[in-house]
Amino acid sequence: MPPSINEPNLQEMFDSLAPKYDRINSILSLGMHHLWNRTFARMLGKSEHLLDLCSGTGKVAYRYIRDYPGSKATLVDFSEKMLLAAQQRYPDAPFTFIEGDIVQLPIDEESQTLASMSYGLRNLSNPKQALEEIHRILQHNGCLGILELTSPSRKHPLYLAHRLYLNFLVPWLGRLCSKNKQAYTYLAESIKKLPSDDYLEQLFQNAKFQVSKKRKLAFGSATIWILKKI
């Protein structure tokens, strides 16, 4: 399946970054993503099964099953090596794995109660189509949780510092840590290019989702939305 992403080589990039992906998230989030993942899991609420989209190496899914013992998760990602990293890291976790595209999920209609997407929304070339596909597979009143790296408001005192961090420090750290400045530059740019909350929330509404909960983290450096299918 062709990946629903906004760069033709992004699948290869994420494959190459899989061994270092958690370090990348630490850099992009200033080390706060562990706390954010925990907050996200708690806001998702208890369910027997979580469909974790754009799952990466499985840290969010693992956080979820730790917080809700007895639950299981299906991890979906277009990167084979990300899923392989998750299998190797959590060999005993109650996970199943699907390698594929979020806009064409091999999942029955209205078969899921809870889905999540962490740090993946900004990499989608067609978020409208992805949201429509997620809507298709969720049951009535099912929920989709989104955790994404965002930017503080332009009026916020830390806006400029956040921009300087993304523009200069993140690429430098990328070159230092992985010798892949281009990948880190892309990831930093993807945060800056993410549309406004108003735009995204209109997109959610157009896809027949209602925002039931929203939380800004670290002065707006990350945002959690809990969406309900309507």
Swiss-Prot record:
Listed CDD domains: AdoMet_MTases (cd02440)
UniProt entry keywords in alphabetical sequence: Menaquinone biosynthesis, Methyltransferase, S-adenosyl-L-methionine, Transferase
Entry's EC annotation: 2.1.1.163
MF terms in GO: demethylmenaquinone methyltransferase activity
Reaction catalysis annotation: a 2-demethylmenaquinol + S-adenosyl-L-methionine = a menaquinol + S-adenosyl-L-homocysteine + H(+)
Family per record: Belongs to the class I-like SAM-binding methyltransferase superfamily. MenG/UbiE family.
Main function: Methyltransferase required for the conversion of demethylmenaquinol (DMKH2) to menaquinol (MKH2).
Entry protein name: Demethylmenaquinone methyltransferase
Organism: Chlamydia felis (strain Fe/C-56)
